[in-house]
């Protein structure tokens, strides 16, 4: 769709104008069976945002391997809407084409956060990670890893093509729903 392409071009231009190149990032994430892969995203945070995590640790409002801060100072000014509407995730369709990800599945976590996994969490590595999933349509802004894990296991245990289609169809509703937006 031309409008989507134009919209992505506008996101790219705004990001480059506000914080320079590159307009996308590659992050090491954990995929199927613990395979490390490079996940692509539009860059909405400052260049050294991952390194700043340690200095902002006391502000972290999440548990386990999650890291979320309300009004995160690492986000580039005026790009909050890109994150709010998950536009930064669109480059992950390249990961789907490469076979590293699926459209639906558990969200891939950073490779350097796996030390926070206990044995039961490893079960989420038995499926391809996804761009969207049960978490994203039910409680996408939760800061509790146990909630993430609960939805991941529910997805794994109930997987079907029909289930994936339902999740895909509900994703836009979840993204634009006021009741789900938050942290």
Residue positions per predicted region:
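Short, conserved beta-strand/loop elements in beta-sheet-dominated catalytic cores
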Residues: 74-100
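Hydrophobic structural segments characteristic of membrane proteins
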Residues: 17, 22, 90-183
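Short, solvent-exposed loop/helix junctions and linker helices
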Residues: 69-72, 83-87, 159-162
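Conserved short-loop catalytic and cofactor-binding motifs
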Residues: 66, 78-81, 153
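Short, well-ordered junction/capping motifs at the entry into regular secondary structure
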Residues: 1-2
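Short, glycine-rich, amphipathic interfacial segments at transmembrane boundaries or analogous
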Residues: 25-74, 132-150
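A hydrophobic, helix-centered structural microdomain
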Residues: 6-51, 161-183
């Amino acid at each position: 769709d031309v409008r989507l392409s134009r919209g992505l071009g506008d996101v790219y231009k705004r990001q480059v104008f506000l914080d320079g190149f590159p307009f996308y990032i590659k992050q090491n994430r954990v995929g199927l069976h613990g395979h490390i892969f490079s996940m692509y995203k539009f860059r909405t945070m400052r260049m050294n945002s991952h390194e700043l995590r340690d200095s902002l640790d006391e502000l972290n409002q999440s548990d386990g391997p999650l890291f979320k801060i309300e009004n995160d100072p690492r986000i580039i000014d005026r790009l909050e809407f890109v994150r709010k509407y998950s536009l930064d995730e669109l480059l992950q369709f390249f990961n789907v084409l490469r076979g590293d990800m699926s459209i639906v599945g558990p969200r891939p976590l950073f490779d350097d956060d796996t030390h926070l996994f206990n044995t039961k969490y490893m079960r989420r590595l038995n499926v391809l990670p996804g761009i969207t999933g049960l978490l994203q349509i039910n409680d996408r802004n939760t800061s509790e890893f146990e909630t993430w894990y609960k939805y991941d296991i529910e997805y794994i245990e109930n997987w079907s093509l029909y289930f994936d289609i339902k999740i895909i169809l509900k994703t836009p509703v979840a993204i634009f729903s006021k009741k789900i937006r938050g942290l």
